[in-house]
Curated annotation (Swiss-Prot):
Major location (coarse): membrane
InterPro entries referenced in this protein's UniProt entry, alphabetically: TatA/B/E, TatB
Superkingdom of the source species: Bacteria
Name of the protein this chain belongs to: Sec-independent protein translocase protein TatB
Organism this protein belongs to: Rhizobium etli (strain ATCC 51251 / DSM 11541 / JCM 21823 / NBRC 15573 / CFN 42)
Chain's gene name: tatB
Amino acid sequence: MFDIGWTELLVIAVVLIVVVGPKDLPPMLRAFGKMTQRARKVAGEFRAQFDEALREAELDDVRQTISDAQKLNPVSSLREAMNPLRQMGNEIKADLQKATAVTENKTEVPSAAMSAPTPSMSLPETPPVVPTPAPAPEPAAVAAETVAAKPKAPRKPRAKAADKAAFAIAAPVENPPAEKPKRTTAARKPAAPKTPVQTKKKKDEA
């Protein structure tokens, strides 16, 4: 342990016997033995603690390696690599859907314009109110009111009546009736030559 040989141990024992004496040497050896035992125990405990620390460090290292191995899962790395590709695919799909929706709307607009709206034949819940005509005034009363409202015209002198008669007689003379258009006579047929018998008869009649 201390790299001491037999000769060195004998020298130490002789020195102790001379210094301590033969009476006090046995209890001193016992105390020395107890001290060595305690030192061994302390060394053993220190060694045990050191070993436990090493084991814990190794376990920590092992745990770290295990956690690193779990983190280095190829599935998760592949998923992370595929995420941008999925996003690009989703964007392309969204653009295609928008384009198809726009074309469908364009095709639906003319078809909707061509289709005539169907008239609604629903009847009203309440019947329409027909306005009642106001009672017309009686014709006799109306005539009486008009007669009462019109003032009587003053009588004209008789001289004016005579002038009117003369004017009525002179009017047709001044404005003669328009001549009637002559009727167009049809083309006369040429007269047949008179026979001597007819000429004789005419002379006799004359």
